[in-house]
């Protein structure tokens, strides 16, 4: 279990990267916080896929230093859009009408006790659901051991190929796994995991991504 605790920073970093960029934009669009958290990973994977296609054409290597800042900028842009959206809804438009900004925005109305109880019970159920889903992996597996099936071996080698080749494109990024031939294969997961893996930690990072995706799955069910 201690080995899993040592990987907690990686899990938290993955969850931030999965949720934050899309969460801001979805909140700007008026979605609830639960729906925004549930749908945000799809936004992030869409952005990761778009970058993985664009970077080879721009001769940009696929690395944390080149991809993660774009995710961060997306979150900042979404936060700005959310702030403007909130201001527009609260003020009935963008004009201050001669009053201070704080007064124009107004004080957010606190949620009632019943709504707070619903939120707490919902997120509590999500936590329980995640622990139920994750416990067999946490209690029965060493994160340094690959999953004992043939398919994970292919996908972990795909992450290795991206780390070595610096190319995460679905149009040839995994060519080393196909005898050097450039074939189409969706690489969203591989590209994302490669942002958090080192050459000697692909298996551990892949296993941590399973925990992150469990959380996404449970939150999606709740939403």
Question: At which residue positions do the language-model features occur?
Answer:
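Hydrophobic alpha-helical transmembrane segments of multipass integral membrane proteins
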Residues: 18, 50, 75, 127-130, ...
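Active-site lumenal/periplasmic loops and adjacent helix-entry segments of GT-C-fold
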Residues: 128-223
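Internal/C-terminal transmembrane anchor helices
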Residues: 112-137
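A residue-identity detector for tryptophan
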Residues: 4-5, 25, 62, 82, ...
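Generic detector of short, locally flexible boundary/turn motifs and exposed helical patches
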Residues: 2-4, 121-126, 201
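Membrane-embedded, hydrophobic transmembrane alpha-helices
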Residues: 1-118
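Core alpha-helical transmembrane segments of integral membrane proteins
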Residues: 35, 39, 122-124, 216, ...
């Amino acid at each position: 279990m201690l080995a899993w605790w040592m990987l907690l920073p990686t899990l938290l970093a993955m969850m931030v990267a999965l949720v934050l960029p899309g969460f801001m934009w979805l909140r700007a669009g008026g979605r609830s916080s639960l729906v925004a958290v549930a749908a945000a990973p799809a936004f992030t994977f869409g952005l990761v896929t778009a970058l993985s296609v664009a970077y080879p054409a721009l001769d940009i290597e696929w690395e944390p230093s080149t991809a993660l800042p774009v995710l961060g900028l997306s979150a900042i842009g979404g936060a700005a859009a959310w702030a403007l959206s909130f201001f527009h809804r609260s003020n009935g438009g963008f004009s201050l009408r001669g009053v201070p900004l704080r007064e124009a925005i107004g004080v957010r109305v606190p949620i009632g006790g019943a709504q707070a109880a619903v939120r707490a019970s919902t997120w509590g159920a999500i936590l329980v659901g995640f622990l139920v889903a994750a416990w067999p992996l946490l209690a029965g597996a060493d994160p340094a051991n690959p999953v004992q099936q043939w398919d994970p071996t292919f996908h972990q080698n795909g992450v290795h190929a991206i780390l070595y080749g610096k190319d995460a494109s679905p149009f040839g990024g995994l060519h080393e796994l196909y005898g050097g031939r450039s074939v189409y294969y969706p690489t969203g997961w591989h590209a994302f995991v490669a942002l958090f893996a080192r050459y000697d930690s692909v298996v551990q990072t892949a296993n941590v991504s399973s925990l992150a995706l469990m959380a996404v799955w449970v939150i999606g069910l709740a939403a």
